[in-house]
Amino acid sequence: VHLTPEEKAAVTALWGKVNVDEVGGEALGRLLVVYPWTQRFFESFGDLSSPDAVMGNPKVKAHGKKVLGAFSDGLAHLDNLKGTFAQLSELHCDKLHVDPENFRLLGNVLVCVLAHHFGKEFTPQVQAAYQKVVAGVANALAHKYH
């Protein structure tokens, strides 16, 4: 992902304020509510029968935290996202058979959650930088599919 020094600074500064536990669970939960067909990958998580059930599900929250932990690793290696996410790409492609479009959807949901949490601090410039990052991460996760 090519970011200007200003974009990189904006992404890093905001990410330092992110509560990974909270934002991860909310982002994954919103993905499952807004795009209900993604729930088929999480059938082992128990009750996903309503938006409240999804958002309150401890397994959704725990996996969201794990997902955002991996995203944090990616932020530390923006120059090598394909390498950073190679194993996760292989897992999601070969073993889990996740539609790579879901990575793009989750990235966009994450941007929405960050905007919700940070309000005016999440300026259009910050959003533009994050859109580049989530697109780069989605492409890296989809790399094994190509």
Swiss-Prot record:
<dbReference type="GO" id="GO:0042744">
    <property type="term" value="P:hydrogen peroxide catabolic process"/>
</dbReference>
<dbReference type="GO" id="GO:0005833">
    <property type="term" value="C:hemoglobin complex"/>
</dbReference>
<dbReference type="GO" id="GO:0072562">
    <property type="term" value="C:blood microparticle"/>
</dbReference>
<keyword id="KW-0349">Heme</keyword>
<feature type="modified residue" description="N-acetylvaline">
    <location>
        <position position="1"/>
    </location>
</feature>
<dbReference type="GO" id="GO:0043177">
    <property type="term" value="F:organic acid binding"/>
</dbReference>
<dbReference type="GO" id="GO:0019825">
    <property type="term" value="F:oxygen binding"/>
</dbReference>
<dbReference type="GO" id="GO:0046872">
    <property type="term" value="F:metal ion binding"/>
</dbReference>
<keyword id="KW-0561">Oxygen transport</keyword>
<feature type="domain" description="Globin">
    <location>
        <begin position="2"/>
        <end position="146"/>
    </location>
</feature>
<protein>
    <recommendedName>
        <fullName>Hemoglobin subunit beta</fullName>
    </recommendedName>
</protein>
<dbReference type="GO" id="GO:0004601">
    <property type="term" value="F:peroxidase activity"/>
</dbReference>
<feature type="modified residue" description="Phosphothreonine">
    <location>
        <position position="12"/>
    </location>
</feature>
<dbReference type="InterPro" id="IPR000971">
    <property type="entry name" value="Globin"/>
</dbReference>
<feature type="modified residue" description="N6-acetyllysine">
    <location>
        <position position="82"/>
    </location>
</feature>
<dbReference type="InterPro" id="IPR050056">
    <property type="entry name" value="Hemoglobin_oxygen_transport"/>
</dbReference>
<comment type="similarity">
    <text>Belongs to the globin family.</text>
</comment>
<keyword id="KW-0479">Metal-binding</keyword>
<feature type="modified residue" description="N6-acetyllysine">
    <location>
        <position position="59"/>
    </location>
</feature>
<feature type="modified residue" description="N6-acetyllysine">
    <location>
        <position position="144"/>
    </location>
</feature>
<keyword id="KW-0007">Acetylation</keyword>
<feature type="modified residue" description="Phosphoserine">
    <location>
        <position position="44"/>
    </location>
</feature>
<comment type="function">
    <text>Involved in oxygen transport from the lung to the various peripheral tissues.</text>
</comment>
<feature type="modified residue" description="S-nitrosocysteine">
    <location>
        <position position="93"/>
    </location>
</feature>
<dbReference type="GO" id="GO:0031838">
    <property type="term" value="C:haptoglobin-hemoglobin complex"/>
</dbReference>
<dbReference type="GO" id="GO:0020037">
    <property type="term" value="F:heme binding"/>
</dbReference>
<keyword id="KW-0408">Iron</keyword>
<dbReference type="InterPro" id="IPR002337">
    <property type="entry name" value="Hemoglobin_b"/>
</dbReference>
<feature type="binding site" description="distal binding residue">
    <location>
        <position position="63"/>
    </location>
    <ligand>
        <name>heme b</name>
    </ligand>
</feature>
<keyword id="KW-0702">S-nitrosylation</keyword>
<dbReference type="GO" id="GO:0031721">
    <property type="term" value="F:hemoglobin alpha binding"/>
</dbReference>
<dbReference type="Pfam" id="PF00042">
    <property type="entry name" value="Globin"/>
</dbReference>
<dbReference type="GO" id="GO:0005344">
    <property type="term" value="F:oxygen carrier activity"/>
</dbReference>
<keyword id="KW-0813">Transport</keyword>
<dbReference type="GO" id="GO:0031720">
    <property type="term" value="F:haptoglobin binding"/>
</dbReference>
<comment type="subunit">
    <text>Heterotetramer of two alpha chains and two beta chains.</text>
</comment>
<keyword id="KW-0597">Phosphoprotein</keyword>
<feature type="binding site" description="proximal binding residue">
    <location>
        <position position="92"/>
    </location>
    <ligand>
        <name>heme b</name>
    </ligand>
</feature>
<dbReference type="InterPro" id="IPR012292">
    <property type="entry name" value="Globin/Proto"/>
</dbReference>
<dbReference type="InterPro" id="IPR009050">
    <property type="entry name" value="Globin-like_sf"/>
</dbReference>
